Amino acid sequence: MHELSVAQSVLETVLDVARKRGAERVLSVRLRIGEFTLLNPEQLRFCLEVLAEGTPVEGAKFEIEIERGYFKCAECGHRWRPEDESLKDPSLHTAFDLSELTELLDLKCPKCGSRAVKLDGGDACSIESVRLEVPGEQHAQG
């Protein structure tokens, strides 16, 4: 379960932002996770909530937005969405490197048939915003 390690990294970053801004507590954290990261949003939220206990992040609202991903052919430039069902294949969850995903799915470009297929978006996890309670300020954005 890589949700735990991602949650730890997110929490460390959020705590660092809160500390630098002199925040008493964190009110909310908005994350964007790509669907190709194969992160489970519910598991990620659970890990964040458990790890946040006893910190200024405890009680914060975790908003998680899913970024859709696409495939792009390196030969002809065609860009397309995968079938949503193909992303539910349990064997995909063994991919540790996102570049393996195109191989596991045995992808071919639907336009030209090339196997030179790359991910185009949906492969990252980012902190979009952090809402803080800072003494003397009205709900600062981090």
UniProtKB/Swiss-Prot annotation:
Gene Ontology annotations of biological process type: protein maturation; protein modification process
Keyword terms, alphabetized: Metal-binding, Nickel, Zinc
Binding positions for Zn(2+) per the UniProt entry: C73, C76, C109, C112
Top-level division of the source organism's lineage: Archaea
Sites where the protein binds Ni(2+): H2
GO molecular function per UniProt: nickel cation binding; zinc ion binding
PROSITE patterns reported for this sequence: HYPA
Function of the molecule: Involved in the maturation of [NiFe] hydrogenases. Required for nickel insertion into the metal center of the hydrogenase.
PANTHER family recorded: HYDROGENASE MATURATION FACTOR HYPA
Similarity field: Belongs to the HypA/HybF family.
Protein name, as recorded: Hydrogenase maturation factor HypA
Organism: Methanopyrus kandleri (strain AV19 / DSM 6324 / JCM 9639 / NBRC 100938)
